[in-house]
């Protein structure tokens, strides 16, 4: 099967599944491209472009459902946007980029397992988000997002849930808007990478738009199940192993 079609199907599935838990799918897109040996120069801008579209869809859907708390989001963005821009401007050689993305995928897999356990527990408690820790956390996540081509939601959601700062759907809504801002900042940080967009990008954008719309509709009503998150984590582990050890 043609690589463009294979990736379109993979991206559709990633967008559907990730949008159902309030994310945009960057780690899934990177995993698919990594498994098929796509060049790092193409992986990063492609993942960010797909992320921007899906995160926009998810943010609107979760926002309309009342799950995005903009004031709670603000301190995270104060730290993350400039650092995502800086990270996006840094172009790592393939020998460093692939292992780094592989490690990020491993961490993302662990976080997915954690959210599978934490989502239910977090519903019963909620505390105010402290501004300074939120800015610091946002800065660290933003830099990593810009460097790798992810949106950072896979790190922010578990943090919010484990700290008891918001219930699961609100955590997902905050993360969706956070992902959107970081993805835009990361892509703007390396405008030159826009020239590395593959010719198949319009096809993939259509695929993720459909998948993301279906997933966002599902997620705004019923978040992805723990079993689904564990399955996604397994895929990320396989892709991470490939990137770290095989390049």
Stretches found by the model and what they are:
Residues 30, 156-157:
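Interfacial helix-capping/hinge residues at the ends of transmembrane alpha-helices
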Residues 170-186:
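Hydrophobic alpha-helical transmembrane segments of multi-pass integral membrane proteins
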Residues 47-51, 175-179, 201-205:
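Short hydrophobic/aromatic, small-residue-rich stretches within specific transmembrane helices
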Residues 40-45, 172-176:
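Small-residue hotspots at the loop-to-helix junctions and early N-terminal turns
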Residues 46-61:
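Transmembrane alpha-helices of multi-pass small-molecule transport proteins
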Residues 186-192:
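Membrane-helix boundary/interface segments in integral membrane proteins
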Residues 1-15, 19, 24, 28-36, ...:
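Juxtamembrane transmembrane-helix boundary motif
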């Amino acid at each position: 099967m043609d690589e463009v079609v294979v990736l379109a199907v993979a991206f559709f599935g990633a967008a559907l599944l990730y949008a159902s838990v309030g994310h945009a799918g960057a780690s899934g897109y990177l995993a698919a491209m990594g498994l098929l040996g796509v060049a790092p120069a193409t992986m990063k801008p492609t993942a960010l472009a797909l992320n921007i579209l899906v995160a926009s869809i998810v943010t609107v859907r979760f926002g309309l459902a009342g799950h995005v708390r903009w004031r709670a989001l603000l301190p995270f963005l104060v730290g993350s946007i400039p650092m995502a821009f800086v990270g996006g401007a840094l172009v790592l050689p393939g020998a460093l980029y692939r292992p780094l993305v592989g490690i990020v995928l491993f961490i993302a897999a662990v976080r997915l397992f954690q959210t599978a356990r934490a989502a239910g527990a977090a519903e019963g408690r909620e505390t105010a988000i402290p501004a300074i820790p939120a800015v610091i956390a946002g800065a660290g996540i933003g830099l990593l997002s810009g460097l790798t081509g992810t949106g950072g939601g896979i790190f922010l959601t578990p943090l919010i849930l484990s700290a008891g700062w918001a219930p699961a759907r609100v955590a997902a809504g905050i993360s969706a808007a956070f992902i959107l801002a970081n993805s835009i900042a990361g892509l703007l940080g390396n405008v030159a990478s826009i020239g590395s967009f593959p010719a198949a990008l319009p096809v993939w954008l259509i695929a993720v738009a459909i998948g993301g719309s279906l997933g966002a509709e599902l997620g705004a009503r019923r978040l992805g199940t723990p079993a689904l998150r564990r399955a996604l984590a397994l895929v990320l582990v396989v892709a991470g192993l490939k990137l770290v050890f095989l390049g």
